[in-house]
UniProtKB/Swiss-Prot annotation:
The keyword Lyase applies. One of its GO terms (biological process) is L-tryptophan biosynthetic process. Pathway: Amino-acid biosynthesis; L-tryptophan biosynthesis; L-tryptophan from chorismate: step 4/5. InterPro entries: Aldolase_TIM, Indole-3-glycerol_P_synth, Indole-3-glycerol_P_synth_dom, Indole-3-GlycerolPSynthase_CS, RibuloseP-bd_barrel. The keyword Phosphoprotein does not apply. It catalyses: 1-(2-carboxyphenylamino)-1-deoxy-D-ribulose 5-phosphate + H(+) = (1S,2R)-1-C-(indol-3-yl)glycerol 3-phosphate + CO2 + H2O. Belongs to the TrpC family. It comes from Campylobacter curvus (strain 525.92). This is Indole-3-glycerol phosphate synthase. Its EC number is 4.1.1.48. Keywords: Amino-acid biosynthesis, Aromatic amino acid biosynthesis, Decarboxylase, Lyase, Tryptophan biosynthesis. GO terms for molecular function: indole-3-glycerol-phosphate synthase activity; phosphoribosylanthranilate isomerase activity.
Amino acid sequence: MILDEIIKRTKEDLKKRKSDYPAQWLGRSLAYNPYVPRDVASALSSSAKEPLRIIAEVKKASPSKGVIRENFEPIRIAKEYEDAGANAISVLTEPHWFKGDIEYITQIRRYTATPLLRKDFIVDEYQILEALVYGADFILLIAKALSSKELKGLLAYAHHLGLEVLVETHDAQDVKKAIFAGANIIGINHRNLDDFSMDMSLCERLIPLLPNGKIIVAESGLYEHEQLKELNRIGVDAFLIGEHFMRQEDIKTAVKNIKEG
């Protein structure tokens, strides 16, 4: 299963990074360059004035599709997203399957004021500290990749550092884990990370399991304004969209079209 492979490789890479650059060094970097994360909850909460909130993704490749965008310029892409009115920007930092780099966060941070998500396979507090040092405002935690205890601990650590957390779910068990962990922002990924199959009716089934007051984010398979309107009608606040935008020549127009119709 691809998720297991990615987690295994992530842990191997992490061991080397921790050896090359210990956590206390990261902490020292933070002391010299303090960074206060931006308000993610306000950016992603649906409102009557702006019902459809977009998390636009900077992504070169994926395990299911390979390279998605050959002409890949992270800073330019992020600036176009911001200019088009994206409410947050997701930055892939996983290097092997997604061709990401954590340096992209720092580069993009210099040129944008929009909240940034570190999207990666986070399994250790070290990666959360990294996210803060490199300039992220929130992180992704995948419920399927973590035990309930691990998810709760990592989420608490992120909140302790001032980072918000998007907890990604795909089934009822994941949702239970997210609620138990105390997640404020819960993602529902239409894509199964084990076999890449899509289930576009997932939000309809999982949203009733969520308590009131949570910010709900729909992920994967989104490419039309009408899809977003319908999902917003049943309770989705924000939409994480990557591949659709990455395949467009005119990214700015694509964001405006999907957001405004």
